[in-house]
Amino acid sequence: MKLQELFSKYIYNWTLLLFIFGGIILLNIIASLISFKFDMTKDHRYSLANGTEIFLSKKENIESRISIQIYLEGNLPSEITNFKNAIKSKLKDFKSIAGNRIEYIFINPNNGTKDAQNELFAQIYDRGQGILPLEISYLKDGEQRQVMIWPGAKMSYSINGIIKESSIQFLPGTKPGSPYGLAQMTDIIENAHNNLEYNLISAIRKLTQKEKKRIAFLHGHGELNLYQTQRARAL
């Protein structure tokens, strides 16, 4: 009788252990299939606004693919790297809703030969109409260092054979020879974090905005007056 009880207890313990391991494996499988995260920040920095989700989900808002090139890559100060990761996370959230209508890539503008770099810098800068460079002075391993970064993104969108392009400036540019210290950048980066989603979705909205057809109204030949055409003008 005692032997039977020991055997039953042995079987019970092993069965319980198998159930526990099976449950853990099942939870891991479910977690890999379902993407979710909890936002515990006061300003819900890591959650998308409802208006953003609605806009991205509607195919009529983004009819074809938007290509986004972000020029924050390479050997960067940790504060800038953290901000870069925030951009990457936000764009990943955008893509999870918009699917292949949004594509993005992070580019190191300092790769390649000096001539290739200068050519890319000129394209990014676009005579002051594109992304403005930012010089940062910081201390690393007891040595004062200086780096020039391009804290922005280029966006392109093709619709009906027409290519539209625009730029986003995430962090302000600096004058040549007047770098920011990392201590000065703290509030600037924090503000950029807070406005990141707004700046991204605003740029996408502007880029994909459909042109309104204009209607011309003639006067003086018996046509409807200004009051009578007011509703049509509002369309």
Label the predicted regions:
Residues 2-235:
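Short, surface-exposed patches at the edges or C-terminal ends of soluble domains, predominantly
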